[in-house]
């Protein structure tokens, strides 16, 4: 089955109010082309999910597209500092911050992948996050041990950027996979944006190349440069000048223009 779509058609699967997950990690292999198209299509009230998020959340908060963020880390790391537009959204109460640990976000996604309403973990006991986010404690029926129940999160749509994909929906991630394989199994719909569309023989010759199997994929988009200005292993480094230009702007519309985003007039 050919799952190849244009970017606009794939992003149109997202509805206002959806929970949307993104693959990659901070400034590495993030699906930025899809994020920019979400803004062009004027999507609103989105719940964003990612373990460690940076440019995506700032773009979507600057555009007024995000209303809730579930993440373990929000920030650019290193020279770029904090996420300005996310911070402004939280401070103005237009964005709800569900602060997690990275592993609790992974656990929430894994619960959805397993098809269960929650999964227990041990590590948050003694943390203020229990009260801040409203996690529940449960008692193990076998040992009597107190554990923390992490509610499953099943994204309505997830976007992953990969180096190679075929038209059937197999995706190859070169380098760290981060949480992408868990996200792919947790999401109700999965969109792969790919640097390169390859023949299906690329995967049939070596099935281990399929980091993401086609059975999980809803749509594939050919998107060379689709993570820029973030980095993609084996393809390109991050574009620091574009990031600096975006972060230098103090007006949200100017920041979006610096990122090369113009809203569609018919959105």
Functional labels for PLM-detected ranges:
Residues 1-267:
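Conserved alpha/beta enzyme-core scaffold
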